[in-house]
Amino acid sequence: MKKYIFGIFVIFLLSGCSFLPQSLNFYKPSYSQNATEERLRSASRKWQKTPYVLGGTSRRGADCSGFTQTLMREFGILLPRTTKTQMASGIKVSKAKLKAGDLVFFKTGRGPNGLHVGIYLSRNEFVHLSTKGGSKIVNLNNAYWKSRYIGARRYMK
């Protein structure tokens, strides 16, 4: 009788396992990295003629952190307002592990904190709002940016 009860218990136990989902990846983004990159590129094109205005957050005029804050809001991500606070939150990411949507930070010596922020796209490219005006896509390996890079933060899962 004990073997019979044990056998039924094992059958129920094993049958319960068959109902587990194939993947337990709860943090899978709702769109791929390529789609994220394309959406970022498309959204940033709307900012190509935006003048650089310290404290601004719209396409009528914005600074670098206003640009990242407003652009990332299109992805449902609410960023802190300033470059300094954007750099202090999120998840720290190494340069080798950058993904589309990660924020990249630089010590430029300009502005109240001397910091600058952009959004990583792919293949070492990032988009930022230039102090000369308008969104620009540039390479992290450019001598100017490479020497000023200070870190990255991830806000997208």
Which role does the model predict for each range below?
Residues 1-4:
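Positively charged n-region of N-terminal signal peptides that target proteins for export
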Residues 13-16:
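C-terminal motif of bacterial Sec signal peptides marking the signal peptidase cleavage site
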Residues 19-37, 42, 77, 92-93, ...:
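Aromatic- and glycine-rich peptidoglycan recognition patches
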Residues 27, 31, 51-100:
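Catalytic cysteine-centered active-site loop
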Residues 37, 41, 45, 65-69, ...:
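Extracytoplasmic/secreted envelope proteins and their assembly/folding machinery
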Residues 42-54:
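N-terminal capping segment at the start of a domain
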Residues 101-102, 124:
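Structural motif
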